Amino acid sequence: MMTNLFSVFDPSTTILNLSLNWLSTFLGLLLIPFSFWLLPNRFQVVWNNILLTLHKEFKTLLGPSGHNGSTLMFISLFSLIMFNNFLGLFPYIFTSTSHLTLTLALAFPLWLSFMLYGWINHTQHMFAHLVPQGTPPVLMPFMVCIETISNVIRPGTLAVRLTANMIAGHLLLTLLGNTGPMTTNYIILSLILTTQIALLVLESAVAIIQSYVFAVLSTLYSSEVN
């Protein structure tokens, strides 16, 4: 059991040992065309309300300096991460957001583009961010080092936070799932099943929260460079 504990995170398949499991990341693209020829249902109404709420919140975070349509990128980022987080909760579907390969590929280009835009177009504003307001002159060099380090590690913290939360929950679900078939006591089996259902509900909440945190922090990082 323990030797196969991390097998759920293996992107390789039995077909020529290729990493075809990454294709599950793009399953969400199959659902997009349905909105063009199906009548609006309750799910679409709820989803549109969620997107509208996110648009208003991200618009507030970006402030008056945000460009028109700038929230579309962060709403799309939220949708992509949340969809892949939920896909990983289904049996036999690969969780792409549990790999730093994907999370870093999302976080690093965003952070790098924000930094390049800020340092090229608002150089003085970016220098001012390195020294918090009210810092004593003696501590200014020290604060510049701290702010620089905290700025550089931002894409890493974004990626690791999402990956660690996905891995932790899936490991617990895998451990309970492997323990169940070896249990002959029906009372213990019912307790394991109840715990697994509760964990599944908790992981569903984590899937939403982590995608929201990723999108909100990305929005805040972009608002700092304007």
UniProtKB/Swiss-Prot annotation:
Keywords: ATP synthesis, CF(0), Hydrogen ion transport, Ion transport, Membrane, Mitochondrion, Mitochondrion inner membrane, Transmembrane, Transmembrane helix, Transport. It is a multi-pass membrane protein. One of its GO terms (cellular component) is proton-transporting ATP synthase complex. GO terms for molecular function: proton-transporting ATP synthase activity, rotational mechanism. PROSITE patterns: ATPASE_A (PS00449). It comes from the Eukaryota. Mitochondrial membrane ATP synthase (F(1)F(0) ATP synthase or Complex V) produces ATP from ADP in the presence of a proton gradient across the membrane which is generated by electron transport complexes of the respiratory chain. F-type ATPases consist of two structural domains, F(1) - containing the extramembraneous catalytic core and F(0) - containing the membrane proton channel, linked together by a central stalk and a peripheral stalk. During catalysis, ATP synthesis in the catalytic domain of F(1) is coupled via a rotary mechanism of the central stalk subunits to proton translocation. NCBIfam families: ATP_synt_6_or_A. This is ATP synthase subunit a. It comes from Anopheles quadrimaculatus. The gene is ATP6.
